[in-house]
Curated annotation (Swiss-Prot):
Residues with attached carbohydrate: N87
Organism of this sequence: Saccharomyces cerevisiae (strain ATCC 204508 / S288c)
KW Chaperone (keyword) present: no
Alphabetized PROSITE patterns for the sequence: CFEM
Proregion positions: 218-238
Organism domain of life: Eukaryota
Sites of GPI-anchor amidated glycine lipidation: G217
Membrane topology: Lipid-anchor; GPI-anchor
Covalent cross-link (Glycyl lysine isopeptide (Lys-Gly) (interchain with G-Cter in ubiquitin)), residues: K161
Compartments, record wording: Secreted, Cell wall; Membrane
Protein name, UniProt field: Covalently-linked cell wall protein 14
Region entry Disordered, spans: 91-203
Compositional bias of kind Low complexity: 93-203
Length: 238
């Protein structure tokens, strides 16, 4: 049964190709039989169209390996002529499978690329949100309240000085007001408190001079009183 099918296949190839009728290459018949045994698509040896469309490369490879001299080219030309007589295109099932596999691998790689870009954009948005949260949480600055409390304590201590230093204390009050109006700048508060300390220290010699003058005046009054008292006692004795 198998021999009858092979014979019918050979006859059909010989009838379909004029070149085969003239010089029938034996290697072409052998290659068709060999490829038909190992083919999973073409299950019959007389299906010329099946070999043309699905086993073209297998037939060509077989012809190049077993046909001597230049018979491989002649045999392949006869095979193509048979395919054109059947209006069959030359193709391969293995090449179509490999092309579909490559297209599926390209699709999977593009899917991976899109998913990785989506994850990277998500990471970027979350990091920007966390950085904005940190920036908003660090916007508070408690240094202004400390500066104002220091200024108030300095001004209260300056009010206990001698009355002769009123001008300097008023100057200190005005400078402390200027410092409190600019309490947002820590360096300006420090500079104004330094000026206030220098003003208070300059007021101290003035109050000391007033106290010493008052002491000298008190001594003169006591001496004058003693002189008057001695004169009165002398007058009474006389």
């Amino acid at each position: 049964m198998r021999a009858t099918t092979l014979l019918s296949s050979v006859v059909s190839l010989a009838l379909l190709s004029k070149e085969v009728l003239a010089t029938p290459p034996a290697c072409l018949l052998a290659c068709v039989a060999q490829v038909g045994k190992s083919s999973s698509t073409c299950d019959s040896l007389n299906q010329v169209t099946c070999y043309c469309e699905h086993e073209n490369s297998a037939v060509k490879k077989c012809l190049d390996s077993i046909c001597p001299n230049n018979d491989a080219d002649a045999a392949y030309s006869a095979f193509k002529s048979s395919c054109s007589e059947q209006n069959a295109s030359l193709g391969d099932s293995s090449s179509s499978a490999s092309s579909s596999a490559s297209s599926s691998s390209k699709a999977s790689s593009s899917t991976k690329a899109s998913s990785s870009s989506a994850s990277s954009s998500t990471k970027a948005s979350s990091s920007s949100a966390s950085s904005s949260t940190k920036a908003s949480s660090s916007s508070a600055a408690p240094s202004s309240s400390k500066a104002s409390s220091t200024e108030s304590s300095s001004s209260s201590s300056s009010s206990t000085k001698a009355p002769s230093s009123e001008e300097s204390s008023s100057t200190y009050v005005s400078s402390s007001k200027q410092a409190s109006s600019t309490s947002e700048a820590h360096s300006s508060s420090a500079a104004s408190s330094t000026v206030s300390q220098e003003t208070v220290s300059s007021a101290l010699p003035t109050s000391t001079a007033v106290i010493s003058t008052f002491s000298e005046g008190s001594g003169n009054v006591l001496e004058a009183g003693k002189s008057v008292f001695i004169a009165a006692v002398a007058a009474m004795l006389i």
